[in-house]
């Protein structure tokens, strides 16, 4: 990930489809959801690359896990994440910004994590993680027992 900012300047004028095609070719080991949400949408987001610079994405694999409601609260936010508001006031706007919670009982977009210091840390989806926690804390609507997250691990 150390060279991602250099690559940003080469890719910044491409549309999302062209960026997807590029990243699919470079990282065939990553699925489309991870490529889109993590690489295409965050292309040029320097603080993401700095915090997780130890990852060599070409040597990583992605594992899908289902976590319980309690386990969702054990995931740490990335250091760069400054907005961690999980209050009822924030929950009250979820109906407008994330209505899929009320249909599915979980978040349907990917939350990408990686192990650090024996904990999972959100690389991508910090806001989705916050909204999911908000929903779990404050809703009277149905809640799923399990929530899908992704863990990116580096092969040794």
State what each model feature region is.
Residues 1-64:
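N-terminal extension/subdomain marker
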Residues 1-24, 116-156:
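Basic- and aromatic-enriched surface patches that contact anionic nucleotides/nucleic acids
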Residues 5-6, 58-123, 134, 140:
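Short alpha-helix boundary/capping and kink motifs at helix termini
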Residues 19, 24, 35, 59, ...:
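Low-complexity, compositionally biased segments
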Residues 48, 53, 74, 81-84, ...:
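Compositionally biased, low-structure terminal segments
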């Amino acid at each position: 990930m150390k060279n991602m900012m250099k690559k940003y300047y080469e890719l910044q004028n491409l549309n999302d489809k062209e960026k997807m095609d590029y990243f699919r070719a470079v990282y065939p080991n990553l699925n489309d959801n991870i490529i889109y949400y993590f690489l295409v949408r965050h292309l040029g987001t320097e603080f993401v690359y700095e915090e997780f610079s130890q990852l060599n994405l070409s040597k990583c694999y992605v594992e899908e896990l289902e976590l319980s409601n309690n386990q969702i609260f054990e995931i740490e936010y990335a250091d760069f994440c400054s907005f961690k508001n999980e209050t009822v006031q924030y929950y009250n706007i979820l109906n407008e910004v994330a209505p899929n919670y009320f249909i599915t009982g979980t978040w349907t977009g990917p939350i990408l994590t990686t192990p650090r210091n024996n904990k999972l840390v959100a690389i991508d989806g910090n806001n989705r993680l916050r909204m999911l926690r908000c929903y779990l804390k404050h809703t009277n609507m149905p809640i799923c027992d399990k929530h899908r997250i992704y863990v990116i691990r580096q092969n040794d």
